[in-house]
Regions:
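Interfacial aromatic "cap" segments that immediately flank transmembrane helices
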Residues: 2-31, 64-87, 145-198, 245-246, ...
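Selective recognition of hydrophobic, aromatic-rich stretches within alpha-helical transmembrane segments
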Residues: 31-54, 85, 95, 121-165, ...
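Long, highly hydrophobic alpha-helical transmembrane signal-anchor segments
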Residues: 1-24, 57, 62-66, 70-135
Length: 265
C-alpha cells in the first residue's frame, strides 16, 4: 500500500468540526457512566471508523446521532471482542503478578467488579511503569489492541459478532500490509504511553488530596475529587481511542471491505 500518514489524516478528520472539543467532552462524560456508557462509546467509535473505512471524509457526528444504533454496534463490538479481551486481561494479570507480589481478587457483585477493574488497571499502570518490561509490554498491548479494533470493525461491517473471531481473515489483512499495521501500532503505543503518564500523575495528585482530606465528609468535595481525577483521564483516553479507531479505519480502506453499508452514524 502507498504510505499513508495515518496520524495526521485521522487528526484532520477529527478536527474538521470546529467544535470537536465538545465531542470529546461529550464522550468523556459518557465514559463516567459504567458499562452502559462504555458500550455506547465503543459503538460510536466503531460506527465512525466504519464510515472512514468506507472512504467517507468527515468528523464524528455531534448532532443527530442515532443513539440506539451506536449502542447496538457497541453490543456487537463487545460480543465480537469479549474472548480477545479475556486473553488480553489474562496477559496483563500475568504481567502484574510478575512485577508485584500483591494478589488480585475481584469482587463478585457488579459494582465490585467495576471497582476491581479500575484498581487492576491502576495497579498495572503504576507498578509496571516502574519495571524494565513496561515498554515491551506496552508494545505487545498496542499490537493486540489494534487487532481487536480490526475485529470490531469486521463485526460492524458484517453486522455479526462472529466476524470478529475470524482470526485467519484478520491476520491475512495484517500480512498484506504489515508495515501500515506496525505504523499504526507504534503511534498507538506512544499515545498509550502518554495516557499512562497522565493517569499516573493524576492518581498521585488524587492520592495526596485524599490524604489531606481524611476526616472530611463533605459530599461536594468528594464529587469534586472524583471529577478532578476521572474526567481528565476520560478525556485523554477518549481522544486516544478515537484517534486509534480512525487510523484503523483509514488502514482498512485499502481492503475495500466496508462497502457503503451505513452512510450515517
Amino acid at each position: 500500500m502507498q504510505e499513508t500518514k495515518y496520524l495526521s489524516h485521522a487528526w484532520a478528520q477529527l478536527t474538521k468540526d470546529k467544535d470537536w472539543i465538545t465531542t470529546i467532552l461529550m464522550l468523556s462524560v459518557c465514559m463516567l457512566l459504567p458499562v452502559v456508557g462504555w458500550i455506547w462509546i465503543i459503538g460510536y467509535e466503531t460506527e465512525w471508523a466504519l464510515l472512514i473505512a468506507q472512504g467517507i471524509e468527515g468528523p464524528p457526528e455531534r448532532k443527530n446521532i442515532d443513539i440506539v444504533r451506536c449502542f447496538k454496534s457497541g453490543c456487537h463490538t463487545v460480543a465480537a471482542t469479549l474472548s480477545w479481551c479475556v486473553i488480553l486481561g489474562s496477559f496483563l494479570y500475568l504481567v502484574l503478578r510478575t512485577v508485584s507480589d500483591a494478589s488480585f481478587s475481584p469482587n463478585i457483585d457488579a459494582l465490585g467488579i467495576i471497582n476491581s477493574l479500575f484498581h487492576f488497571w491502576a495497579a498495572f499502570v503504576i507498578l509496571s511503569a516502574r519495571s524494565s518490561i513496561f515498554m515491551p509490554v506496552l508494545a505487545v498491548v498496542s499490537l493486540y489492541v489494534n487487532f481487536m479494533v480490526i475485529a470490531s470493525l469486521r463485526a460492524a461491517i458484517c453486522r455479526n459478532p462472529a466476524a470478529g473471531y475470524q482470526a485467519g481473515h484478520i491476520l491475512g489483512m495484517i500480512g498484506r500490509d504489515l508495515n501500515g499495521y506496525l505504523n499504526i501500532s507504534g503511534m498507538t503505543m506512544i499515545a498509550m504511553f502518554i495516557g499512562n503518564i497522565v493517569f499516573i500523575a493524576l492518581s498521585q495528585v488524587a492520592a495526596a488530596m485524599i490524604l489531606l482530606s481524611l476526616g472530611i465528609s463533605n459530599m461536594v468535595f468528594r464529587i469534586f475529587l472524583f471529577l478532578m481525577f476521572c474526567l481528565p483521564v476520560a478525556i485523554v483516553y477518549t481522544l486516544i481511542s478515537l484517534m486509534d479507531y480512525a487510523m484503523v479505519g483509514l488502514w482498512m480502506r485499502q481492503f475495500n471491505e466496508a462497502g457503503s453499508a451505513h452512510p450515517h452514524l
